[in-house]
Amino acid sequence: MLGFRHVIRATSKRFATSGTSMVRKTVTSGNSNAIRSATSNVVPPASSAAAASAPSTIKRVPGYNKTLEDSLNGTILENPVETQATQSSNEINWYTSYHGIGSKPFSDETQNALSSALNADDIEIKPDGLIYLPEIKYRRILNKAFGPGGWGLVPRSETIVTAKLVTREYALVCHGQMVSIARGEQDYFSETGIPTATEGCKSNALMRCCKDLGIGSELWDPVFIKQYKKKHCTEKFVEHVTTKKKKKIWLRKDREVEYPYK
């Protein structure tokens, strides 16, 4: 009997030892999984996260590092001939030079001619209500201030032609010094209209350059615009001759409704 009891106790101890070791292994495995899970849920420092999420290259905006013709999907109409000045000549390459810009003011007589008030009869108004000065009036004011031949418009870039637009940069030079730089633009509807559009582009640049000389500065004054439209202009309901659509347009009080409206 003693031997039998000893065997049973030994077997129980063996089973208990085996069961305990199994429990320990399970607990140990569970602890390692919990540690592994906790480690994976740890939020990295802000600097580490930023470094990990930072792209390898800087994201550029559309059109970055592109020429204007590439951005507009246009083509260059011609390659301008650049005049290279030599050390022995006084010739200036106006395509790249900024000679005389802001160096000295013009005479009082010239300034008075440039800043004189516009004649109300010279100002026109578009059907949408935008008032403007015709391009030929700008040329007359420049001729009065600097004299014929005392000023000129020189190109500063190539002529860029897109599917619907012609654009080019010009500089206004008066009495041998640069005054202003502006980019002209003009729409066109067919290829046969490109030559005319290039002239319209030049005229548009001239009018923009004249803003720096103070010519017609009141055209950008909201108070003057309201007063001029109230005194010299009116709105009328008209009908388009072709489409028969009715709309309201602006025109001067001394003008009649013209085609294509009636």
Curated annotation (Swiss-Prot):
Subcellular location: Mitochondrion matrix, Mitochondrion nucleoid
Mitochondrion among keywords: yes
Keyword presence, Nucleotide-binding: no
A Pfam family assignment: Mgm101p
GO CC aspect terms: mitochondrial chromosome
Alphabetical list of InterPro entries matching this protein: Mgm101 (IPR009446)
Superkingdom of source: Eukaryota
Gene Ontology annotations of biological process type: interstrand cross-link repair; mitochondrial genome maintenance; recombinational repair
GO MF term set: single-stranded DNA binding
UniProt keyword list: DNA damage, DNA repair, DNA-binding, Mitochondrion, Mitochondrion nucleoid, Transit peptide
Main location: mitochondrion
Family recorded in the similarity comment: Belongs to the MGM101 family.
Cited PANTHER family: MITOCHONDRIAL GENOME MAINTENANCE PROTEIN MGM101
Functional description taken from the UniProt entry: Performs an essential function in the repair of oxidatively damaged mtDNA that is required for the maintenance of the mitochondrial genome. Binds to DNA.
Listed name of the protein: Mitochondrial genome maintenance protein MGM101
Protein's organism: Kluyveromyces lactis (strain ATCC 8585 / CBS 2359 / DSM 70799 / NBRC 1267 / NRRL Y-1140 / WM37) (Yeast)
Gene behind this protein: MGM101
